[in-house]
């Protein structure tokens, strides 16, 4: 069963972006992850008794899965900020400020064999995302209020230190189709995946990631279903089984804070003889996966 989102529409929508970005002809999918909501992703989520009375981990929740995949793309932060408690279950408290996020051990896919360290790395991130957005955990589905006071935008800034300059939640009802697509293309051209939500009359709500678009203007969607159905779609989603085309909204402007060193965006790492570091200071021989790396005082976003 897909995760249900209890959507409140009290979102503040701005009609312009603070930053103008040149729109590219197309953007190849930015994400390499194909994550989901069950094991190992949910190994740190709370347990509830199943139909046999045995303890079972709740599902991650699609909001947390989408947030986690976007954060993994940015490989940020190295360490969280402060402490947070789930208002719907006050026994769920996370000390973000004491958590080092182990990006190096988060795998793009967990279909094949993986280590305990790799499982813990992704499970920690996704559980922390869930607590940050006040996830209501369940065995069949985990849900949250996408426009709640402590929603995704608040969580990204408060607990994970993302730049709040252009970060906002916007509702499609405030835009024409052309304006909406322009926002999408601008963010993706800037290397900023989008967290997207919509409702279906037959399946409830879902939150997923937009991470690219093709030359025909179709948007690449990562649904958070272990790679299933990932592909290019018209934004109107008039597709049986994927018709999350009601009350669409999105979180745009998701990026780490600017630094004085600047950021260089590239599709491949420069020469192999330079020294590379991850954001948390580990030395790597050469970046072999997408993410953010530091070399000679500059940050490189490898696409």
Q: Language-model segments: which ranges?
A:
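Catalytic Cys-His active-site segments of thiol-dependent hydrolases/isopeptidases
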Residues: 216-235
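Active-site-adjacent structural segments surrounding the nucleophilic cysteine of cysteine proteases
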Residues: 19-145, 214
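C-terminal outer-membrane/trafficking sorting elements
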Residues: 264-303
């Amino acid at each position: 069963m897909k995760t249900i989102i209890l959507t409140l529409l009290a979102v503040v929508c701005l009609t312009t972006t603070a930053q103008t970005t040149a729109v590219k002809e197309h953007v190849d999918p930015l994400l390499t992850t194909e994550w989901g909501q069950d094991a190992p992703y949910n190994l740190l989520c709370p347990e509830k008794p199943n139909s046999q009375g045995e303890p079972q981990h709740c599902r991650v929740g699609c909001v947390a899965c989408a947030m986690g995949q976007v954060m993994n793309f940015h490989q940020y932060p190295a360490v969280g900020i402060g402490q947070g408690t789930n208002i719907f279950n006050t026994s769920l408290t996370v000390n973000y400020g004491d958590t080092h996020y182990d990006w190096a051990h988060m795998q793009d896919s967990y279909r094949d064999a993986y280590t305990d360290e790799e499982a813990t790395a992704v499970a920690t991130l996704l559980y922390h995302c869930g607590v940050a957005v006040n996830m209501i955990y369940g065995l069949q589905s985990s849900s949250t209020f996408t426009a709640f006071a402590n929603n995704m935008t608040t969580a990204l800034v408060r607990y994970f230190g993302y730049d709040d300059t252009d970060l906002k939640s916007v509702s499609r009802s405030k835009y024409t189709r052309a304006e909406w697509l322009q926002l999408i293309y601008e963010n993706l051209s800037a290397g900023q995946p989008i967290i997207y939500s919509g409702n279906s009359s037959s399946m409830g709500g879902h939150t997923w990631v937009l991470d690219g678009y093709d030359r025909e203007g179709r948007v690449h969607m990562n649904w958070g279903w272990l790679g299933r159905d990932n592909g290019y779609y018209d934004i109107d989603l008039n597709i049986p089984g994927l018709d999350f085309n009601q009350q669409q909204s999105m979180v745009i402007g998701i990026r780490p804070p600017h630094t004085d060193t600047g950021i260089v965006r590239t599709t491949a790492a420069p020469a192999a003889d330079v020294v590379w570091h991850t954001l948390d200071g580990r030395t790597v021989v050469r970046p072999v996966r997408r993410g953010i790396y530091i070399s000679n005082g500059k940050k490189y976003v490898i696409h």
